[in-house]
Swiss-Prot record:
This is Putative uncharacterized protein C18orf15. The chain crosses the membrane at residues 133-153. The gene is C18orf15. GO terms for cellular component: membrane. It is found in: Membrane. It comes from Homo sapiens (Human). It is a single-pass membrane protein. Keywords: Membrane, Transmembrane, Transmembrane helix. The keyword Membrane applies.
Amino acid sequence: MQGQGALKESHIHLPTEQPEASLVLQGQLAESSALGPKGALRPQAQSPDVPVSWWQGSGKRLSHRLPHICSQPPLGPFLPLTWPSCGFFGLGGAASASLGLEVLQDSVSTWARGPCCPVHPQSLTVVCMCACMCVCVHVCACVYVCMCVLVCMCACACMRAHRYFLMDCAGICSPHGPGTQ
């Protein structure tokens, strides 16, 4: 009986400042191996060193199949702010372009490593964010959903960084690079 008590006390708890984190991946983090130091979420095995604190969103749903992924954007000093509403933040395409494609590629590759799609784990949800807060979601059905088509520069840069030239944001710009025709 004493052994059972010890097991009950050995639970690994997520940090209290992010109580919603356990909702995001819907039970995929039940095993202690999915938790890193201090209870931080650990990404999939192919990228064990990538922090995923920005994956700990509100637990809401972008759709019936995608977990809510709005949280701290992984752009470091460029955007030290939270992103609570999944939408255009109002910084504009020029600010986006000033970040450079290299920074965008870094951010995209970091986001792309997070576990997300519960239906097809091999097809991760790819989230591209830049200064104008344009988001491209690579849905489980391998189709891009542009959630911010008015500032198409971000979406095109997102697809260029991922080498997915599947759409051109309703013809506003071409998939060959930001702002090109």
